[in-house]
């Protein structure tokens, strides 16, 4: 159906919805893999077009945990891994912040994306910092396995461990 519509009205590919999203970004947000592939077959230009909120389709897919779509975008547009949203966050920042552990694990295992773990956003936070700030303990374990990431400090001078220590109240009781 998408093919028929876009063949008849090719300009729809570049139209934006009321939230400022392109067709590709919308398809990525809802996990419509076949639609994403169809749109990428036609053109990859919208991979590099941000929404009104400053995020790109790869960020939208990551935020919603659509690993297959993130991988497809990376396969067809390898440089998209370097794209930053308006907060200076890459795709791994987004996955860590939201707690999409399977995506975090996938990105940290790939030789071409594991370096994203040392990326710092506009506040100097790495994906690990964001995972700690948002209590995404599963992602923390994966990200903390890289010693380089553990040593990085954000703009407040805090490591991820420092953030965790500052967030724990003295009367917390931990159970296993």
Language-model regions, residue ranges each:
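Ankyrin-repeat boundary/linker signal
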Residues: 15-16, 49-50, 83-84, 119-120, ...
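Solenoidal tandem-repeat scaffolds enriched in leucines and small polar residues
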Residues: 1-50, 54-55
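Conserved ankyrin/ankyrin-like repeat signature
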Residues: 1, 34-35, 68-69, 102-103, ...
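Ankyrin repeat domain, specifically the short helix-to-loop turn at the C-terminus of the second helix
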Residues: 4-11, 38-45, 72-80, 108-115, ...
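Conserved hydrophobic residue in the first alpha-helix
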Residues: 24, 58, 92, 128, ...
